[in-house]
């Protein structure tokens, strides 16, 4: 009987915690800083993850909730936690173009670079966020990092037609001769996309046919 009671109590506790976490995520999505602070004061762990492995900090970063990001970091949310897919809060903020959040995360110790895999700079160039690109480069991001798909940040910007992001990268003099998985350069990608502005930009940066 005692074991049965313990099991029932444990299930009840888990149910309450899950419900509280769902409510916390809802508050984060709505940008309700006061409600989020209340849940944290009640002892809810800011590093708890949802079914997809996203922490509360990741959700707030993806949505650009700068005030909430600062609050969560002050409550010991870990900025370098990764999802099963390898995403971090900084990567999600970079993808969304949330410069203020990116700055807060980096100032709190978020890793700008990684030894392997996707980086925040890859995400920023892929999405075409030039201000984030410049900031990450200024903070030491590897301008020539090769993503798992074989592309550099410059190639990602060019392939997606992001002129401003490509310009932001070219100010830092990346390697314009690098080749992608099929042997294509950034210039070849620009030509394939019929983007004359990018073609001219790359040629001025030293890219050759």
What role is predicted for each listed range?
Residues 50, 83, 114-116, 147, ...:
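Ankyrin repeat boundary/linker residues
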Residues 35, 67-68, 100-101, 131-132, ...:
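Conserved ankyrin/ankyrin-like repeat signature
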């Amino acid at each position: 009987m005692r074991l049965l009671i313990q099991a029932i109590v444990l299930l009840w506790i888990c149910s309450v915690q899950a419900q509280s976490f769902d409510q916390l995520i809802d508050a984060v999505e709505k940008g309700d800083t006061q409600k989020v602070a209340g849940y944290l004061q009640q002892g809810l762990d800011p590093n708890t993850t949802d079914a997809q492995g996203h922490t509360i900090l990741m959700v707030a970063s993806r949505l650009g909730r700068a005030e909430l990001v600062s609050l969560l970091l002050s409550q010991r949310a870990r900025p370098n936690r990764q999802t099963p897919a390898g995403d971090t809060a900084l990567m999600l903020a970079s993808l969304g173009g949330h410069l203020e959040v990116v700055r807060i995360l980096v100032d709190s110790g978020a890793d700008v670079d990684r030894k392997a895999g996707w980086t925040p700079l890859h995400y920023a160039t892929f999405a075409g966020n030039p201000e984030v690109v410049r900031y990450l480069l200024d903070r030491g991001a590897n301008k020539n990092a090769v993503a798992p798909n074989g592309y550099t940040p410059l190639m990602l910007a060019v392939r997606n037609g992001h002129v401003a992001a490509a310009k932001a990268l070219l100010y830092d003099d990346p390697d314009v001769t690098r080749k992608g998985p099929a042997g294509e350069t950034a210039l070849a990608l620009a030509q394939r996309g019929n983007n004359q502005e990018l073609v001219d930009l790359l040629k001025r940066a030293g890219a050759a046919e």
